[in-house]
Amino acid sequence: MKCYFVRHGKTQWNLEGRFQGANGDSPLLKESIHDLEKLGDYLQDISFDAVFSSDLKRAKDTCQIIMSRNQHPQTITFEPALREWHLGKLEGNKIATISAIYPHQMQAFRHNLAKFNNSIFEAESVYQTTKRVSSFVKFLKDKPYQNVLLVGHGANFTASIRTLLGYEPAVLRAKGGLDNGSVTSLETEDFEH
């Protein structure tokens, strides 16, 4: 099975440098829509056996734009398990402001999730958010799918993809994150390797 993970397009809050999380949401930027159409063109010949998207509007809109360009129509299933990391009190706040107040926590959030203290912000733990996504992906194991499209979010997908690859929490985001509108593919036969 080949899984195509797509991060939603760039939003107003991405532009403003705000945390969105699982409860904050903002619309896609107009210029992002054009980029997503190009991504849809790039993926247009892939026949997806299943298409799943986070149920948050920015991801739903991204998925619908991509699939509107696909040569093989497929029903989109909106899946709460693919929601962004619940970031609690961080949601809606400017990243620069939080970084000034909690420099060590933001350094940990960006580069060493093992040191991120989610309870300060009433947020999901790294384990909770990655377990949610990796469990959903592993649920697909017994399905007769060859190609699966999953549309979701940057912080969650970055950590979850690397969890699926066997990385420890300390290095899940050590090399940065996923760009808006990017696609990352993982292929597996047994969901163990």
Could you say what each language-model-derived stretch is?
Residues 45-47, 140-146:
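Glycine-rich phosphate-binding loop signature in dinucleotide/nucleotide-binding domains
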Residues 48-55, 77, 147-151:
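Short glycine-rich phosphate-binding loop at a beta-alpha junction
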Residues 167-193:
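Domain-level recognition of soluble alpha/beta enzyme cores
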Residues 8, 81, 153:
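Active-site glycine-centered loops adjacent to acidic/histidine catalytic or metal-binding residues
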Residues 1-4:
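Extreme N-terminal starter segment of soluble prokaryotic enzymes
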Residues 154-158:
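GST superfamily/GST-like fold recognition
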Residues 7-71:
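Active-site-proximal alpha-helix that buttresses catalytic centers in soluble enzyme cores
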Residues 13, 69-132:
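Phosphate-handling substructures
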